[in-house]
UniProtKB/Swiss-Prot annotation:
Family (UniProt): Belongs to the heat shock protein 70 family.
Keyword Nucleotide-binding attributed: yes
Location of the region described as Disordered in the Swiss-Prot/TrEMBL record: 664-697
Basic and acidic residues bias locations: 675-691
Official protein name in the record: Heat shock protein homolog SSE1
Location in the cell: Cytoplasm
Length: 697
């Protein structure tokens, strides 16, 4: 069975967690880091995923795609696109479906991949990291995404997981996942009729800021309000610092880092480190060697100067707090605790502003970097048939009202508000319509004027067929089960026609009726299910044929990555064998090879080395294996002789040690027997003297 996996899909880095019988663990990656860079790099033969991509980002800047969370499911025509493009060094393009893709040079040619594809590449790497660490099968995942993701973005994230070979059992809001982590592991939550504990969660990460208000009782969580600022995060601080130094270096060193993508990236990376240093210190130096044109730059920044640079951002700190409280219909005084998560909340001026907004001290009982992933792993475990977890129920909140629209046939109305703003989900509503034939239904946001710019009004559309009107009737009642599922997707779960039939129903006997009285019946009308209708959904999810094609493509790329890695490993093994064997041939192995063998093998090693740095520099896995086996055919014979002699020496040494131990033991036993004999003789002599004594008393 699959190990429950929670993925905190972060913009700068992602955190991976798994649920096991002993609890929830964070999974470390191949370099033992507890988070993995969320990016994908493209090279001449293979991709560089996560840590590998980060290591090559500066040298491969135009072919490395980061900020994945920001472009998944986003339309190229969306008003956010221009803002997002500022943070990309790779070229963003418009795909055929209107979504965003990235153009990179890969495998020697220009190629375009959709944002969903690239996110899937990263998620596949995350899956591999978990499988390598746990040595288990991983398919089920709870995917933590921003609360500001619309339906299209949530579907795109789920599709990315599917392309990566994962089954997204739930797409959950990231701050809600952190709240679940809080609720599951807190042992002092109120119970029964006690007043619920109200906790505000403030998450400021790399690219966005979310505030959610949760109401807790033991085993229960209800999100009361959520608000956010999509363009307020650590990267905005980094960019402000970078722009400050760009202007300074332009005047001081006569260089413009804005004209050089690599230089700009290096300064922004250094700016991120400087920001972290200034969270603990009031001032810090800023130095980069050969940033561009062989120019070394040097400067410094104080915490006070940083706060001046980000003053426009700081003015927006309280807005999400105010909106979340308003949606929850609460005041700051109603909040019991304020939990902060996300790396950017470590900045002192932000902590002070958040504390002032709630007029209370901040709590850090949650791990700021790992709470979301742990909550997601627990949520995935809830869906596991094999892992038993403590009962915990949680509900999220509809930010916008959703109505369902239908073809007007019999009814006066052609739509109904089904899921009001502020209502909880998952939620199900059953409605009845009178239909004259097949029809379509559409889910739309009720008040499009309140939606963020660029957000589509339409959510989904369904074609409902198989409607049969009884002879002599003008319409037939159709029942529809409308649902907002646990992932926040709006669906029609089922649809069927109903009919009224007359049945006989027994009348309960009177209290004074005799026991042997004949039962009496009455005729009643009952509504029963008649025909199940067919539903064809048109959502933002990828069509099955397209999804399968992308899955196949990802599997091919993953196989190519694996082949390249194995080929490089074989090449390194061959190279190491050449150098190691050459060194040992004149030393340890010298006595175990004839002069003829030495000459022959040295010649083979020289030719292999020459081949490695010439035509074999970029060869195939099979050729590296063949070259290795050719050398090993003689080298391993000599090594075998050496190992046999070494084993003989070890056996001789072991025999000598055992003989010495036996001799030592025999000597000890002999000494022990001699001591015992002497003691017996001494005792006998003593007893003899005692027999000759005369008692004068």
């Amino acid at each position: 069975m699959s190990i429950p996996f929670g993925l905190d899909f972060g913009n700068n880095s992602s955190v991976l967690a798994v649920a096991r019988n002993r609890g929830i663990d964070i999974v470390v990656n191949e370099v033992s880091n507890r988070s993995t860079p969320s990016l994908v790099g493209f090279g001449q033969k293979n991709r560089f995923l996560g840590e590998a991509g980060k290591n090559k980002q500066t040298s491969n800047i135009k072919n490395t795609v980061d900020n994945l969370k920001r472009i998944v499911g986003l339309d190229h025509a969306h008003s956010d696109f221009e803002e997002e493009a500022k943070f990309f060094s790779s070229k963003l393009v418009k795909m055929e479906d209107g979504k965003i893709g990235a153009q990179v040079r890969f495998a020697g040619e220009q190629q375009v991949f959709s944002a969903t594809q690239i996110a899937a590449m990263f998620m596949n790497r995350a899956k591999t990291i978990v499988q390598d660490e746990t040595k288990g099968k991983v398919t089920d995942v709870a995917l933590a995404v921003p609360a500001w993701y619309n339906e299209a973005q949530r579907y795109a994230a789920a599709d990315a997981a599917r392309i990566a070979g994962l089954n997204p059992v739930r797409v959950v809001n990231d701050v809600t996942a952190a709240a679940v982590s809080y609720g599951v592991f807190k042992t002092d939550l109120p119970e029964g009729e006690e007043k619920p504990r109200r906790v505000a969660f403030v998450d400021i990460g790399h690219s966005s800021y979310t505030c959610s208000i949760g109401s807790f009782k033991k085993g229960e969580l209800k999100i009361l309000g959520t608000a956010y600022d999509k363009h307020f995060g650590g990267r905005n601080f980094d960019r402000a610092i970078t722009e400050h130094f760009a202007e300074e270096f332009k005047g001081k060193y006569k260089i413009d880092i804005r004209e050089n993508a690599k230089a700009y990236n290096r300064v922004m990376t250094a700016a991120e480190k400087l920001k972290k240093v200034l969270s603990a210190n009031t001032a810090a130096p800023f130095n980069i060697e050969s940033v561009m044109n062989d120019v070394d730059v040097s400067s410094q920044l104080t915490r006070e100067e940083l706060e001046e640079l980000v003053a426009p951002l700081l003015k927006r700190v309280t807005e999400p707090v105010t909106k979340a409280l308003a949606q929850a219909k609460l005041t700051p005084e109603d909040i019991d605790f304020v939990e902060i998560i996300g790396g950017t909340t470590r900045i002192p001026c932000l902590k002070n502003a958040i504390s002032a907004a709630f007029n209370k001290p901040l709590s850090t009982t949650l791990n700021q970097d790992e709470a979301i992933a742990k909550g997601a792993a627990f949520i995935c475990a809830i869906h596991s048939p094999t892992l038993k977890v403590r009962p915990f129920k949680f509900e999220d909140i509809h930010e916008y009202s959703v109505s369902y629209h239908w073809d007007q046939q019999v009814e006066d109305e052609d739509h109904l508000e089904v899921f009001p703003a502020g209502s909880s989900y998952p939620s199900t509503k059953l409605i009845t319509l009178h239909r004259t034939g097949d029809f379509t239904m559409t889910a739309k946001y009720t008040n499009p004027e309140v939606l963020p710019a660029g957000m589509p009004e339409e959510i989904a559309k369904w074609e409902i067929t198989g409607v049969k009107v009884p002879e002599g009737e003008t319409s037939v009642p159709v029942k529809l089960k409308l649902r907002c599922d646990p992932s926040g997707f709006h669906i029609i779960e089922n649809a069927y026609t109903v009919e009224d039939i007359k049945v006989k129903e027994q009348i309960p006997p009177a209290a004074d009726a005799p026991e042997d009285a004949e039962p009496e019946y009455k005729e009643v009308t009952k509504t029963v299910k008649k025909d199940t209708l067919q539903i064809v959904a048109h959502t933002f999810a990828l069509e099955e044929a397209v999804l399968n094609e992308l899955i196949e493509k990802e599997n091919e790329l993953a196989a190519q990555d694996k082949l390249v890695a194995e080929t490089e490993d074989r090449k390194n093994t061959l190279e190491e064998y050449v150098y190691t064997l050459r060194g040992k041939l004149d030393e340890e192995y010298a006595a175990f090879a004839s002069d003829e063998e030495k000459t022959k093998l040295k010649d083979m090693l020289a030719k292999a080395e020459e081949w490695l740095y010439d035509e074999g520099y970029d060869s195939t896995k099979a050729k590296y294996i063949a070259k290795y086996e050719e050398l090993a055919s003689l080298g391993n014979v000599i090594r075998g002789r050496y190992m046999a002699k070494e084993e003989e020496k070890r056996q001789a040494l072991r025999a000598k040690q055992e003989a010495a131990q036996m001799a030592e033991m025999a000597e000890k036993l002999a000494a022990q027997r001699a001591a015992e004999q002497k003691a017996q003789e001494s005792k006998a002599e003593s007893d003899k003297d005692a027999e000759g004594d005369i008692d004068l008393d």
